[in-house]
Amino acid sequence: MSPFGQQLRELRRARKLTVNQLAVYSGISSATISKIENGKRGTPKPATIKKLAAVLKVPYENLMAAAGHIQAFPEEIREASEGYQSVYEIYQTAVTRGAEHLPIFNSQKWEHLSKQDIENLSKYFDFLSSEAKKRASSS
């Protein structure tokens, strides 16, 4: 399996999509998707990658870099974006739980929040997280 094929499979599974569902939503045949995932087909064309990125809800540039069509960001930029990686991981967790549609992931909703609003949200999140942890440990 190619690294791109492996990444494609992981993204598809994280979104709980079958090969056939990804095919229907992207307009790419299920045979082509299967061949890409299993490394039996070469690197997909940018147009194919664009369709996959849209359905999988990942940045087109990330898949283009994974496929080798564009160069990945230099190390300095990657190090500077560790905070963004954390946000991406939070979003990925939401995706695996089917919650990516919630307003908390809409950046426009954040524009009107004050510092105090965000601090209150953080406190409430800490409370919810603590309660969830208690429930998990008692089950």
UniProtKB/Swiss-Prot annotation:
UniProt DNA-binding region: 19-38
Domain HTH cro/C1-type: from-to ranges: 8-63
Gene Ontology terms: biological process: regulation of DNA-templated transcription
Disulphide bond pairs: none
Presence of the UniProt keyword Transcription regulation in the record: yes
Keyword Transcription regulation: yes
A Pfam family this chain is assigned to: HTH_31
Keywords annotated in UniProt: DNA-binding, Transcription, Transcription regulation
Molecular function per GO: DNA binding; DNA-binding transcription factor activity
Protein name: Uncharacterized HTH-type transcriptional regulator RghRB
Source organism of this protein record: Bacillus subtilis (strain 168)
